[in-house]
């Protein structure tokens, strides 16, 4: 229990500090098609640490009758103090036609440790159920405006089609940190 939580915290910190990178690839505009055709797009990325591949990220944007479904799976094999742990993060987001968040599910699995959260945008709040092990608890967060999932920022930016020098502001929700 405690070791898995510590490994999760360490993995997320490594990503946030930039010690684990997603590698260099084509410019964002080359990864996704023009704003008129975001449907059915897929992106694979390697996750590198000190130049060594430690995992992959797979993101898929699928069209739905009333918006999109954004699926992302991240798999990493981390070696922490000589102990190798597999870490799998899986998220699905159901997005509105403007790519803002409507509802989502998220799971994190590492060994026997499991964490999950599902939620929906409802009346200016993000209403969630958080599950750790066999325990589930509710969480209600007030919203200042529409939310975007991290993996949905690139398609939303392309959809916005900004001109050079124009700023775009996106309120991002990360289910892994509930922030």
Regions found by a protein language model. Name each.
Residues 1-8:
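N-terminal Sec-pathway targeting helices
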Residues 8-44, 109-179:
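Solvent-exposed helix/loop surface patches that form functional interfaces
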Residues 49-132:
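N-terminal mature ectodomain segment of secretory-pathway/periplasmic proteins
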């Amino acid at each position: 229990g405690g070791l898995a939580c510590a490994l999760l915290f360490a993995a997320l910190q490594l990503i946030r500090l930039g010690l684990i990178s997603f590698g260099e690839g084509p410019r964002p505009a080359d990864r996704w098609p023009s704003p008129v055709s975001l449907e059915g797009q897929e992106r694979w990325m390697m996750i590198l640490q000190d130049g060594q591949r430690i995992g992959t990220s797979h993101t898929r944007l699928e069209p739905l009758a009333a918006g999109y479904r954004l699926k992302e799976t991240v798999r990493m094999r981390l070696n922490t103090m000589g102990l190798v742990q597999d870490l799998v993060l899986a998220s699905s987001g159901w997005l509105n036609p403007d790519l803002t968040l409507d509802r989502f599910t998220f799971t994190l699995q590492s060994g026997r440790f499991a964490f999950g959260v599902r939620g929906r945008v409802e009346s200016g709040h993000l209403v969630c159920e958080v599950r750790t092990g066999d325990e589930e608890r509710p969480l209600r967060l007030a919203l200042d405006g529409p939310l975007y999932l991290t993996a949905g920022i690139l398609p939303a930016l392309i959809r916005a089609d900004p001109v050079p020098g124009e700023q775009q502001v996106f309120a991002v929700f990360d289910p892994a940190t509930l922030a």
